[in-house]
């Protein structure tokens, strides 16, 4: 039969999970329609998990990319370097290699712990045969602010390339060195390569991890706000961007009324007349950074990141459907493998005449 979709899977529940309060959540395939061989895209799957159908495959927003094998399920063995400390890290190659070693050891531990465990055979086989690890980063936006670089300007793009080319360089050295000492991953050995790990880099969202790391920025995205109220299990506290606070202090403007105005403007500093243009650009919030700048930086990094990036974007209220299409098309043209989350604009004040998604700080391309 020439069919698209899982015709035998009707009524099957997918993504079924049991939560700590013993509640159950799942998505169920209600109906399937055969349409022959033509491409089919249905983004109307009834789910709060952003699932949709693409050529019969139940699809979701994608965090990272690995090759698909019928008899293996990819294993996520990942960690991240905190780029707030990049100046120390870049001059210490062994630190980067140790991070890769840490992940390879975790993969080995996973192999040992899953031996004989029911339903883990496919994942264990992937860990044995591919030994994929993913070293990424967090704190990129904070690093830019520490150095006074605006998101997407020439300086930020230069250090962005330096970061990921350096991590890739020492990651390649590590996986080849350890491959010679301890043996290559079987899938690499079959291909005639000396590599301990088939893949070595990916950039996760790192939202929770970045907060634990002294509330630094996430994987690739700018700060959502320069000031916000953070609610934890037992406490609430007000976060103020420490680098902005330092700048305000140097200008004698680190005052309660200034912070009140920042709060009233959804964490933005664009209304502060005593800041110059460069300073305002440095402390732009996520919704104030044009998608083009974020995509360009991610594209520069993608050349070195084999498993992809969790790339989030903000779509402003004044963007049309054509704008959103052009953003996705531009990301594809810039070799971005996937996009992760789409956030709505933080405030309507960004609906400025003449300001479009491809407005950028430094349009070098």
Pin down the residues of each PLM region:
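Hydrophobic, well-ordered secondary-structure elements that form the walls
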Residues: 15, 43, 78, 140, ...
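Function-dense linear segments that define catalytic or interfacial modules
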Residues: 62-127, 137-143, 147, 216-217, ...
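Structured core elements
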Residues: 39-44, 52, 77, 82, ...
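Conserved active-site and cofactor/substrate-binding residues in soluble primary-metabolism enzymes
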Residues: 73-76, 90-101, 128-138, 158, ...
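HINT superfamily self-processing domains
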Residues: 1-61
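Internal maturation/activation junctions in enzymes
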Residues: 96-124, 128, 132, 147-206, ...
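Catalytic alpha/beta core of large soluble enzyme barrels
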Residues: 33, 107-109, 113-115, 201-365
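Short helix/loop capping segments that flank catalytic or ligand/cofactor-binding pockets
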Residues: 49-55, 60-61, 73, 86-87, ...
């Amino acid at each position: 039969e020439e069919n698209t979709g899982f015709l035998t899977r009707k009524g099957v529940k997918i993504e079924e999970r049991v939560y700590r309060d013993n509640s159950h959540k799942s998505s169920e395939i209600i109906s399937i329609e055969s349409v022959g061989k033509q491409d089919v895209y249905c983004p109307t799957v009834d789910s709060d998990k952003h699932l949709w159908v693409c050529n019969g495959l139940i699809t979701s927003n994608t965090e990272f990319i690995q090759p698909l094998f019928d008899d293996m399920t990819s294993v996520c063995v990942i960690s991240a370097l905190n780029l707030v400390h990049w100046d120390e890290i870049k001059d210490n190659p062994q630190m980067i290699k140790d991070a890769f070693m840490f992940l390879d050891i975790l993969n080995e531990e996973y192999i040992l712990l899953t031996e004989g465990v029911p339903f883990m055979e496919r994942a264990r086989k992937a860990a044995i045969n591919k030994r994929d690890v993913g070293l990424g980063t967090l704190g990129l936006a904070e690093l830019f602010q520490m150095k006074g670089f605006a998101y997407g300007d020439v300086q930020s793009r230069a250090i962005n390339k330096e970061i990921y080319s350096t991590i890739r360089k020492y990651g390649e050295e590590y996986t080849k060195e350890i491959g010679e000492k301890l043996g290559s991953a079987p899938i690499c050995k079959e291909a005639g390569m000396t590599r301990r790990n088939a893949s070595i880099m990916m950039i996760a969202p790192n939202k929770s991890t970045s907060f634990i790391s002294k509330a630094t920025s996430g994987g690739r995205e700018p700060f959502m706000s320069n000031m916000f109220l953070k609610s934890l299990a037992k406490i609430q506290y007000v976060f103020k961007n420490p680098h902005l606070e330092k700048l305000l202090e140097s200008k004698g403007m680190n005052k309660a009324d200034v912070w009140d105005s920042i709060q009233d403007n959804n964490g933005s500093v664009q209304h502060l007349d005593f800041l110059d243009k460069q300073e305002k650009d440095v402390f732009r919030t996520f919704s104030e950074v044009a998608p083009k700048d974020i995509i360009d930086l991610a594209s520069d990094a993608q050349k070195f990141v084999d498993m992809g990036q969790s790339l989030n974007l903000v779509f402003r209220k004044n963007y049309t459907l054509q704008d959103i299409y052009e953003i996705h098309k531009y990301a594809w043209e810039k070799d971005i493998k996937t996009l992760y989350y789409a956030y709505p604009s933080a405030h309507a004040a960004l609906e400025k005449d003449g300001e479009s998604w491809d407005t950028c700080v430094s349009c070098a391309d």
